[in-house]
């Protein structure tokens, strides 16, 4: 399972621990990923996604999964999220 947010593309970053004596050792900064189920109002069902806590706040701020995906760039989304975005667009066009 990859350590990458399915909605924002946020992943692992690399940096240094720096001691008081200024010794540097490599370390990894891991994203705060959570397994959540987000509801789509258009499709009327939930989708299980692995997203960062920041992405969860952003989805809530933008008014839900449907509106978040409508504004999201395709390059940042995972294959699963892209499929959901296309299904939502198709359902909205049919309605």
Swiss-Prot record:
Gene3D superfamilies: Ribosomal protein L28/L24 (2.30.170.40). InterPro entries: Ribosomal_bL28, Ribosomal_bL28/bL31-like_sf, Ribosomal_bL28_bact-type, Ribosomal_bL28_sf. SUPFAM superfamilies: L28p-like. It holds the Pfam family Ribosomal_L28. It comes from Dinoroseobacter shibae (strain DSM 16493 / NCIMB 14021 / DFL 12). GO terms for molecular function: structural constituent of ribosome. This is Large ribosomal subunit protein bL28. Keywords: Ribonucleoprotein, Ribosomal protein. The gene is rpmB. The keyword Endoplasmic reticulum does not apply. GO terms for biological process: translation. It comes from the Bacteria. Belongs to the bacterial ribosomal protein bL28 family. One of its GO terms (cellular component) is cytosolic large ribosomal subunit. The keyword Ribosomal protein applies.
């Amino acid at each position: 399972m990859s350590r990458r947010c399915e909605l924002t593309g946020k992943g692992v970053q690399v940096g240094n621990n720096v001691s008081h004596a200024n010794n540097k050792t490599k370390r990894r900064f891991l994203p705060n990923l959570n397994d959540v189920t987000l509801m789509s109002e258009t499709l009327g069902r939930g989708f299980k996604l692995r997203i960062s806590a920041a992405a969860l706040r952003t989805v809530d701020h933008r008014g839900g999964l449907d509106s978040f995906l409508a504004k999201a760039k395709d390059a940042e989304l995972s294959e699963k999220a892209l499929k959901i975005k296309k299904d939502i667009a198709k359902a909205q066009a049919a309605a």
